Regions:
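Glycine-rich flexible loops
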Residues: 1-140
Length: 140
């Protein structure tokens, strides 16, 4: 199960987390999945430390998707595959579980936050990401 946490995935996660223009606070989230197992950055950990610290927690992806549909309490604690692991899954676990891409890198960049909260955000994103598989989620 740990074989998903490759050095390349950890390096990607750490590099994103170490760039202050791409991250705010603990740095967003990365996840990697195969079949029903998904590893995601744990709540309260820092993405920048992905290469040196145990910041990822394995969850049952189907159980996380069920939480999005109202099963469970929404914390995704019940989806954790290792009952001894004290790490809590990210609050955005259900979002990552719903996406079919094997790797999801989700950051909180300053520029993206500015554009997403701007009335021009959607058209700018559509122009910049034309032809790419991207989802625009308006800033809440």
């Amino acid at each position: 199960m740990h074989d998903l946490l490759t050095p390349a995935f950890r390096t990607l996660s750490a590099r994103l987390g170490q760039d202050p223009l791409r991250v705010q606070g603990p740095g967003g989230n990365t996840s990697i999945k195969s079949n029903d197992v998904m590893w995601i950055k744990a709540s309260g950990t820092e993405l920048a430390n992905a290469e040196s610290d145990p910041i990822f927690v394995a969850v049952d992806r189907n159980a996380a998707k069920a939480e999005a549909e109202g099963a469970g309490d929404g914390s995704c604690k019940a989806t954790v595959l290792d009952p001894v692991n004290s790490l809590r899954p990210s609050i955005e676990t259900t979002f990552h579980a719903a996406l079919d891409w094997p790797v999801v890198a989700h950051t909180h960049s300053i520029a993206t936050s500015v554009h997403a909260s701007s009335p021009e955000g959607r058209p700018i994103a559509q122009e910049k990401l034309a032809g790419l598989p991207a989802i625009f989620v308006p800033y809440a």
